[in-house]
Regions:
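Non-catalytic C-terminal accessory region of glycerolipid acyltransferases
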Residues: 120-233
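Short acidic-hydrophobic, aromatic-tinged amphipathic segments that line or gate anion-handling sites
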Residues: 51, 108-111, 201
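Short gly/ser/thr-rich secondary-structure transition/capping motifs
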Residues: 43-51, 119-120, 174-177
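Catalytic core of membrane glycerolipid acyltransferases/transacylases, capturing the structured
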Residues: 12-35, 42-44, 59-115
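Short amphipathic alpha-helix with an adjacent loop that forms part of the alpha/beta core around
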Residues: 53-58, 125-128
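Membrane-interfacial terminal anchoring regions of lipid-handling membrane enzymes
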Residues: 1-19, 28, 32, 55-57, ...
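Generic preference for hydrophobic
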Residues: 51, 64, 86-87, 193-195
Length: 233
């Protein structure tokens, strides 16, 4: 069902690329994709979710830093936060037809083999997206982490915040315990998503912003996991 739903998503994605739509109108498609597949996960696998802290979402464009441990949050990002740009390998944009359609959503295309200049690409393109009224989604761990694990957060999101003044919103969850990385197996339960208070980068260094975000996210994940229902039975 996941693959079938994704197939329908790409069909409508290609169709939308042919129409003169605004980014808000185009975003209806990935939002519907995320909502429909997470709904299917609930109906078929008994895997539901709750979202807390939505009152913390700023009314102006912001940068959301997400814990990354599962495929699930790549679906949820489409409806948990307002229309936002996410980063991807620039090679995706080069895929015939599909890459062209994806580019209409204004992703941040990064040459990940470029080392430090990849951070500069992220900041430059991220600044443009924020100026256009879009948010920016960042997974600072850079890859999906196993449950209970993390590593030093990448600095690109925090650096973008410091250079633009955009607030950073940390987002924690326990999805990796129910839908593990590199696995299609989903365990019944409830994923808890918690949106943290915005971090104002004014007067802070990128390192300080990053540390505050990581400390909050990792502490909140530990709290979620320790609570009743925080892990599968």
């Amino acid at each position: 069902l996941l693959f079938l739903g994704t197939g329908f998503f790409f069909f409508f994605l290609l169709l939308s690329a042919l129409l003169p739509l605004s980014i808000e109108q185009r975003y209806v498609i990935p939002r519907a994709w995320g909502l429909s597949l997470t709904w299917l996960a609930k109906v078929v696998c008994g895997l539901g979710y709750v979202i807390e802290g939505q009152e913390n979402l700023p009314s102006r464009p912001f940068i959301s830093l997400w814990k990354h441990s599962s495929v699930w949050e790549t679906l949820a990002q489409m409806f948990v936060v307002p229309p936002a740009s996410w980063s991807l390998k620039r090679e995706v944009i080069w895929i015939p037809i599909v890459g062209w359609a994806v580019s209409t959503f204004k992703p941040i295309a990064i040459n990940r083999s470029a080392g430090h200049s990849a951070v500069n690409q992220m900041v430059q393109q991220g600044r443009e997206r924020l100026a256009s009224g879009m948010g920016v989604i960042v997974y600072p761990e850079g890859t999906r982490m196993a449950p209970g694990q993390t590593r030093k957060y990448g600095v690109s999101g925090a650096l973008l915040a410091c250079e633009t003044g955009a607030p950073v919103v940390p987002i924690a969850h326990n999805s990796g315990y129910f839908w593990r990385r590199r696995s299609l197996l989903k365990k019944a339960g409830t994923i808890r998503v918690v949106i943290g208070p915005p971090i104002d980068p004014t007067g802070l260094t990128a390192r300080e912003v990053n540390e505050r975000a990581q400390q909050w996210i990792e502490a909140k994940v530990a709290e979620i996991v320790a609570a009743p229902g925080g892990v599968p039975r």
